[in-house]
Design a protein with these regions (language model features):
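Conserved beta-loop-alpha segment that forms the PLP phosphate-binding cup at the N-terminus of a helix
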Residues: 67-96, 100, 104-108
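Active-site C-terminal subdomain of aminotransferase-like
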Residues: 28-29, 208-298
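N-terminal glycine-rich, Lys/His-bearing helix-loop that initiates the first secondary-structure elements
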Residues: 1-40, 392, 400-410
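PLP-dependent enzyme catalytic core of the Aspartate aminotransferase-like
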Residues: 4, 347, 351-410
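Conserved PLP-binding catalytic core of the aspartate aminotransferase-like
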Residues: 302-336
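Conserved active-site segment immediately N-terminal to the catalytic lysine
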Residues: 196-208
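Active-site phosphate-binding strand-loop segment of PLP-dependent enzymes
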Residues: 129-188, 202
Length: 410
């Protein structure tokens, strides 16, 4: 007979139910997408595959809100960073990049490894890119030595969202021809973004956040100006070359063996986003972000982002009080409640924890997440006030704007 007596001595906690993955990406992959990916691999030179390729490339245009080309790579977002650089720049070119957090710093490193000169505009990691600073620097660049402006739209390490339309207006006001390159890895399909309307030349994105997929795919959305510039860009490129990609893309194919099962998942993700409607997706993320901030305020803790207009709708980064360790808090929450929160990165290591609320997410999931945080604060001995969860529930219960018809117009 089976012996169903416990084999645990109580030293190790046995977790039941699903793990709560509340880092700001990779995010929870919905069952629908998992089932779609669980399909036989097909011939990637077949008519069936061509239909799949054309469908997902067209669908991604709707997500980026562009009528232009979208390039898809089997790579993480870092690959799409590199692709944006090598297709538009030459050795010795100058670019302007705003320090908004850990990931702007990493993007700077990629550019510098290719011999690009980076004018790194310093920041305190608590505010987004400054349109006034951008206009001032571009106005001073009368010889147009600056070839590109590089901005992280939503800084995943800090929960700060830069205001891209204001940066575009600064470029236009300065009458400067620099390209505008924008990283939307943690904002695409979570926060309103408009590639064409906002005059962005290259948008960078990844699969593992708002698109609700596993890691493994990344994207560049391209303006016609970016495509013209690439003809004279001298940085070495092969795998990342847009022109090599766009030729077979016209018929739904790729110049490499594509990640077929991820493309199945992407097709299902696009269908889910279309069913909900992008405007409603953004509204849902806004609600969950505001409810999370209500909880943080009720706890008496400090939100990293200093400017309310720059609050992120995909994650909230929170300081722990001086003298306490955010990583120890995260460890307590993981041990007791089987929930993962995002760590503080670089200079915020041990000082900040990050709550992800993006992708496939609903009110009850948020309530459970915030319950786990509040119980963890108590268990870890982190000074806080009670009532954060109730503040979030009250926020969620507030009257909502009427949902819009589910459309995903380009």
């Amino acid at each position: 007979m089976y012996n169903f007596a416990s084999t645990s001595d109580g030293a190790d906690m046995i977790h039941t139910g699903r793990h709560f993955l509340q880092i700001p990406g990779p995010t929870n992959v919905p069952d629908r997408i998992l089932r779609a990916m669980d399909s036989p691999v097909i011939d990637h030179r077949s008519a069936e595959f061509a239909n799949l390729g054309k469908e997902v490339l067209e669908g991604m245009r709707g997500i980026f809100k562009t009528s232009g080309h979208v390039v898809l790579y089997p790579a993480s977002g870092t690959g799409a960073w590199e692709a944006a650089i090598v297709n538009t720049l030459s050795p010795g070119d100058r670019v302007l990049l705003f320090e908004t957090g850990h990931f702007s710093s990493l993007w700077r490193g990629v550019a510098e490894k290719f011999g690009v000169q980076v004018d790194y505009v310093p920041g305190n990691w608590r505010r987004g890119a400054s349109a006034a600073e951008l206009e001032s620097r571009l106005a001073a660049d009368r010889g147009h030595a600056i070839k590109a402006v590089m901005v992280v739209h939503n800084e995943t390490s800090t929960g700060v969202t830069s205001r891209i339309p204001e940066l575009r207006r600064a470029l236009d006001s300065a009458r400067h021809p620099a390209l505008l390159l924008v990283d939307t890895i943690s904002s695409l399909a979570s926060i309103d973004y408009r590639h064409d309307e906002w005059g962005v030349d290259v948008t960078i994105a990844g699969s593992q956040k708002g698109l609700m997929l596993p890691p493994g795919m990344s994207f560049n959305a391209l303006s016609e100006k970016a495509l013209r510039v690439t003809e004279n860009a001298k940085l070495p490129r092969s795998y990342w070359d847009w022109q090599e990609m766009l030729k077979p893309n016209r018929s739904g194919f790729f110049p490499y063996t594509p990640p077929t099962n991820l493309l199945y998942g992407l097709r299902e993700a696009l269908l889910m986003l279309r069913e909900e409607g992008l405007a409603n997706v953004f509204r849902r993320h806004d609600r969950h972000a505001e409810a999370t901030r209500a909880a943080v305020r009720a706890w008496g803790l400090e939100i990293v982002c200093e400017e309310p207009r720059e609050y992120s709708s995909s994650l909230t980064a929170v300081f722990v009080p001086e003298g306490h360790d955010a990583d120890k808090l995260r460890a307590v929450i993981l041990e007791h409640f089987d929930m993962s929160l995002g760590a503080g990165l670089s200079k915020f290591a041990g000082k900040v924890f990050r709550i992800g609320h993006l992708g496939s997410f609903n009110d009850l999931m948020l309530a459970g997440t915030l319950c786990g945080v509040e119980m963890g604060l108590r268990l870890a001995g982190v000074p806080h006030k009670e009532g954060g969860v109730m503040a979030a529930l009250n926020s969620l219960a507030a009257p909502q704007k009427k949902s819009e018809p589910a459309t995903m117009a380009r």
